Amino acid sequence: MSYLLIKAKTGEYNKWKSFYDKHLEMRKASGSKGSRIFRNASDPNETMILFEWNNTESARKFTQSDDLRLKMQESGVTGKPDFFFLDEIEKTSA
């Protein structure tokens, strides 16, 4: 399984989350299998989303899409988001 971690400055969380929720079908169609949303404990305007993805290639295509870029601008994301492509190596019990 591949993962995509996006780190972005989202500004007003509720506004951003509304746009995020409306983008669900696009994420699914692009290969996303779901996500977990985190907020930086030291900076509530910094949000991190960890997506589970079919494969890294699909995740890369998603991050390069004009649709994602437009939705990020509309939702209030400021600055350039950071994208990290991850492969799970091992899962431990603790």
Regions found by a protein language model. Give the residues of each.
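Metal-dependent phosphoesterase signature
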Residues: 73
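Short S/T/G/P-rich N-terminal loop/turn motif that feeds into the first structured element of a domain
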Residues: 1-66, 70, 78-94
